[in-house]
Design a protein with these regions (language model features):
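Rossmann-like dinucleotide-binding domain that binds NAD(P)(H)
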Residues: 1-74, 161
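Short, conserved clusters of charged catalytic residues that mark active-site
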Residues: 6, 155-158, 168
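A general structural signal for well-ordered alpha-helical segments in protein cores
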Residues: 7-8, 143-144, 170
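Residues at helix-coil transition
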Residues: 16, 148-152, 178
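Short arginine-rich
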Residues: 169-179
């Protein structure tokens, strides 16, 4: 799950709080099964559901499938709350925002529950991205900003403690997959990073 740390960091950023507990189910189903290194098959997880609990009661979930790339949007982020839903879709660069204002207004059985009123759809992109490369340009931007911080002797955009917490979420997910039980972040981090 360490390969998903950037998603765990994004969850912290969006929620404005630190993960408390992780429950995960996953495994290796397709990728690298035919490879051998020193006589062993690599143990790279290629699919998982990871639920992350936060102190406020908020939850975030990662749905990882590294062998289902052939879809219109193989990366989707959804944020759902009592006011509505925000969806970011890649590589179509689509952002959708909808409100719950008209949900559940059925006049007759069989009619859709929503009318679509309040749904905004737009395409978004950063014109500074010269080469999309990995992660649809995000890696390019990360490298640019990191290089600038090094040149200016400035702070990294993501501080070390945030990075450590997100790696710990990945480790907790691995443990949860191995044991079938929730894992507490307190078992992976010192108290000052919780």
């Amino acid at each position: 799950m360490e390969k998903c740390c950037h998603y765990f960091n994004l969850m912290e950023l969006i929620l404005g709080e630190r993960a408390r507990r992780v429950f995960a189910s996953g495994g290796q189903r397709v990728n690298h099964l035919d490879e051998r290194y020193q006589g062993r098959t690599p143990d790279i997880l290629d699919s998982a559901f990871v639920i992350v609990d936060y102190p406020s009661g908020a939850r975030a979930m990662l749905d990882l499938c590294m062998f289902a790339e052939n879809s219109v949007d193989n990366e989707q982020i959804s944020i759902v709350g009592d006011a509505g839903k925000l969806e970011s879709l890649l590589p179509s660069l689509t952002l959708r925002h909808s409100r719950r204002a008209d949900w559940g207004q059925r006049a007759v059985w069989g009619q859709p529950s929503g009318t679509g009123r309040g749904v905004a759809v737009r395409r978004v992109w950063d014109t500074n991205i010269r080469y999309a490369g990995q992660h649809f340009g995000a890696s390019y931007i990360e490298h640019q900003r990191f290089a600038q911080a090094v040149r200016d002797d400035g702070p990294a955009e993501i501080p070390l403690d945030e990075g450590l917490r997100c790696v710990a979420v990945g480790l907790a997910a691995h443990r949860s997959i191995e044991t079938g039980l929730p894992a507490l972040l307190a078992d992976f981090l010192p108290a000052e990073l919780l």
